[in-house]
């Protein structure tokens, strides 16, 4: 059985609360889009949990949580979020959490761009009010095909992926230098960052479309 929870663009509508209630009876809880700019707070007997990327289903034993194709994932933030809930006794494993190989990676430069642009606008009193987490920049690059997807982390040794990464970095360094007079980012440092994320999150990355198709065919409850 499939259950979809969506809003009508009013902002804080209580979607997370509804999902938390539905998750109690679900087998799989999927977040299909967004990044870590959103958030919801869940209070249980184990404490207070503030979640930005993880669905609240992560707090329910036996529920599989999926971060879907449409998401932009800040892997450093996700690592911290997992660490925080594990400190309160919630164990997170690749059997419990699956990341779509087609989801977009929020790259280090996305937060840098967001911060610099917001600071520039603030000087003229026209700051946008951004969360400074790089979400808009990550989505912009997603649609311009100027970023990596999680599945690319499996192929960092391939020349084609290295070439794409270098091309993206050259363009970003031109933007950062031309618009904000910033020092260029280093390719070796960026590649090392990608390799570290691959080692940490590789076991969690999966073909979630295939997984969900199988879950539905088996009659599982998917929210």
How would you label these PLM feature ranges?
Residues 1-223:
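Non-transmembrane, aqueous-exposed alpha-helical and coiled segments at domain scale
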């Amino acid at each position: 059985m499939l259950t979809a929870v969506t809003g009508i663009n009013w902002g804080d509508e209580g979607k997370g609360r509804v999902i938390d209630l539905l998750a109690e009876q679900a087998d799989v809880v999927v977040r299909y889009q967004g990044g870590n700019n959103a958030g919801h707070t869940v209070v249980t007997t184990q404490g207070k949990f503030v979640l930005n990327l993880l669905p609240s289903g992560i707090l329910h034993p036996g529920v599989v949580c999926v971060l879907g194709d449409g998401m932009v994932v800040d892997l450093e933030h996700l690592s911290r979020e997992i660490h925080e809930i594990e400190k309160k006794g919630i164990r997170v494993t690749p059997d419990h959490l699956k990341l779509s190989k087609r989801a977009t990676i929020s790259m280090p430069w996305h937060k840098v761009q967001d911060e610099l642009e917001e600071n520039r606008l603030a000087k003229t009193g026209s700051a946008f009010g951004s969360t400074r987490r790089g979400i808009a920049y990550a989505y912009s690059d997603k649609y311009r095909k100027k970023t990596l997807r999680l599945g690319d982390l499996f192929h960092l040794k391939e020349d084609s992926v290295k070439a794409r990464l270098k091309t993206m970095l050259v363009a970003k360094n031109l933007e950062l230098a031309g618009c904000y007079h910033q020092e260029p980012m280093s390719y070796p440092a960026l590649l090392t960052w990608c390799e570290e994320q691959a080692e940490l999150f590789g076991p969690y990355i999966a073909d979630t479309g295939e997984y969900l198709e199988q879950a539905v065919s088996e009659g599982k409850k998917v929210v």
